[in-house]
Design a protein with these regions (language model features):
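Short, charged/polar micro-motifs that form catalytic or ligand-binding hotspots
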Residues: 1, 35-39, 65, 69
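Non-catalytic, well-ordered alpha-helical scaffold segments
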Residues: 5-9, 43-46, 55, 77
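Generic structural signal for hydrophobic core residues of well-folded globular domains
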Residues: 15-19, 52, 83
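Short amphipathic alpha-helical interaction segments
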Residues: 38-55, 70
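Short, amphipathic alpha-helical interaction segments positioned at domain boundaries
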Residues: 67-83
Length: 83
């Protein structure tokens, strides 16, 4: 899959909006409530979240149910710089 920087940016902006000291970003294939992520397929979102983790842009990625559910702790300093 080709890396889409717009998708990466939309994911990071969505994570930034949701996350705080007590709240993490939760994405589910079955209930994508994030307006910024609506233009992207589930596979695109999962791929780009994993790329964000590999690039050190997000912390604490957790996946379950074969990738149908993902949880992200927050942005890293590099994630904030990217934005």
């Amino acid at each position: 899959m080709r890396l889409n920087n717009d998708c990466v940016r939309d994911i990071l902006l969505s994570v930034e909006e949701v996350c705080d000291f007590n709240e993490s970003f939760r994405y589910s294939k079955f209930s994508n409530d994030f307006e910024r992520l609506q233009p992207y397929s589930h596979d695109e979102i999962i791929y780009h979240i994993k790329q964000c983790e590999l690039a050190g842009l997000i912390t604490s990625m957790f996946g379950a149910d074969g990738g149908d559910y993902l949880e992200v702790g927050d942005l890293t300093p590099e994630g904030h710089k990217f934005l």
